[in-house]
């Protein structure tokens, strides 16, 4: 069966657009935020005039959360992690925290040299647990139990593609707009080039340390993009906090 989702900044996600997406069988929408208004508006303003965007996005989420399944992804690093509770509280104050999904995700360091503002996976695993605990103590259920996966992500699936605004096809979010990783176009079809070959021939688990790891069914060796392009083999945060997540999930059942 066919399924599709979109990732958007949420600025143009009006009710009319939401109904159009629904008709096209696009039920799931991920909206990426960088923090509460004061942080988000500093990082994600309009190109024309640097006007703020947060308030418009929040209104759109309120208008559309009963039409589509909306997932709020909060990008976090060492400079904005302290504000993520305030962001979640915005949805609580507006009465929609139970009508959306909310999770935090570390800003990816895709450079060859470590960025001091980005969390390592070990650092993020600790921040994630502290965040979950704070949410639990406030009576919020946002802890999701990790489940075994059968494919690391859509990047290595032969039948999954990302489409950018120009109609170009890519295999990974991190590759979008980088033309050297383009694998075709919706109008001309898929191009069986080097970029596509790297993903389709990717071996998810080819390291000895992964073979004997109890977390292997939950991560399958980590991010293919980082492993292929940057040769990074940093263990998933689940390596460090899987047992804590299960505990917090159990506790959340009684919240």
Residue ranges and their predicted role:
Residues 176-255:
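Flexible mid-to-C-terminal extensions adjoining Fe-S/redox cofactors in radical SAM and related proteins
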